[in-house]
Amino acid sequence: MSRRRKANPTKLSENAKKLAKEVENSQEENDCDMLAKPQTPTIIIPGHMDDTPNPAGSPHDASIKSSSSTISDHTSTSATTGISDFPDILAQTEHGCSVLIDGNHLREIINSVDTQDGKQDLLSDVIRQLTSIKERLTNDESPVKDDLKEDPDDMSPMLHAGNFDSEMLLRQHELMQHQQQQMIIANMLKATQSLPLLFNGGLNYEAILNNPVLNATIAGHLPNPLASNISLLQKSISAKLAAAGNMQTVEKVETPLNLSKDTPSPTAIPQSPLSGFRLPYSLGTNYGSDGQLFNNCSPNSSGKSTPGNTSVTSEVATPRPQAKSPNHIKRPMNAFMVWARDERRKILKAYPDMHNSNISKILGSRWKGMSNSEKQPYYEEQSRLSKLHMEQHPDYRYRPRPKRTCVIDGKKVRVNEYKTIMKTKKDLMWGDEPGFSQPSDLQMDLASHVNLLNDLTQHHHQSHLLQTAE
């Protein structure tokens, strides 16, 4: 061993340095993964090869002492020491160190190759094999996805999927109706400036709503749903006005609409601007809804409009029954409905107070964000349900529900078209009047409701006068 070291010391030192550098470079590439996983066995490569002095420029005894001390520090099991000795490749685990590659055996294998390039290729192949083992372990350690736990804490990441901003919906759902009430009050204050005749005594709504003749006529002639709606309207006006008198007025509201159900605590005000007039409609959020003001509109509606006004029909047919027939056959579920059935239950369990419209938006956003491969099982379930439905009901034919219509000036018009016509006429009317700004949607709804109440009042007064004359 000493003869070979003396014969060509420079060459052995250079080869040892190159070998140590290559092994250390491979170790540095894997340092981050080894530090992140302390339980994984790590390979320890002693770094004394770089620090080994050149034998040509230093005494032989010093080099042997440095080499032997370094090997002893790393608990090497090699039998010999020296410049050309290779360190043992150790694996550090929680149970201690173990030798993976013996330094003497590694030296013999490398020295069996004659050329320098062959030795480098041999070491590169060893490093490549270790790298492939590391990649295989990394791929095998991917976490197995457990079933989704129906826990409110685990539902939040699910709601963030898709293009839709689910976090904003949840935030709006938590804050609720406070700013919506403020927007209504602020718009009503603006309406007092643009509609002075409407709120300053131009129309006596109290006399209209508290008229006993009108109330008796309504109770006797109108169908039960419309009569009950009007009576509820009369009762809610006084209660809402009393509550509105104690509400704090807001000049300008720039925050977005909230879907919260929490009502703000009323603040006492000495003189409220709303206390000087009567409102012809309720301040609830369901004013102008189709279910209350258009119950008289049905496919079988018929009648004549009031002279001089364009309004809904006065002679009302029986409303369409809402209850479905016991023999009604439901349509088979499509792929989205199959997928959303279980997802909707999970969201409702986590957020019981969330509105159904917000849940539908979240589910629709997540469904759009899913890939075709993720949707494929649900499309297969849709095909299976469709075939099963066809076998169970071979004579089934889908018949869509007819559109709701109203009779205006002897013509059948859909409810949505009627709303569009009324809005267009009001826009033209306000545009011709000088000194008035463009009305808001709230003002347009208010004017439309006033016309409906006036039509009902005028018609029932005429009916009462005719009955009295007879």
Curated annotation (Swiss-Prot):
SUPFAM superfamilies: HMG-box. Residues 294-316 have a biased composition (Polar residues). InterPro entries: HMG_box_dom (IPR009071), HMG_box_dom_sf (IPR036910), SOX/SOX-like_TF (IPR051356). Residues 329-397 bind DNA. It is found in: Nucleus. Disruption phenotype: Hermaphrodites have an egg laying defective phenotype and a reduced brood size. They display a protruding vulva phenotype and there is a failure of anchor cells to fuse to uterine seam cells (anchor cell-block). Animals also have defective vulval morphogenesis and gonad migration with increased pi cell divisions, which thus leads to an improper uterine-vulval connection. Defective response to CO(2) sensing. Its main location: nucleus. This is Transcription factor egl-13. It comes from Caenorhabditis elegans. The lineage of its organism: Eukaryota, Metazoa, Ecdysozoa, Nematoda, Chromadorea.
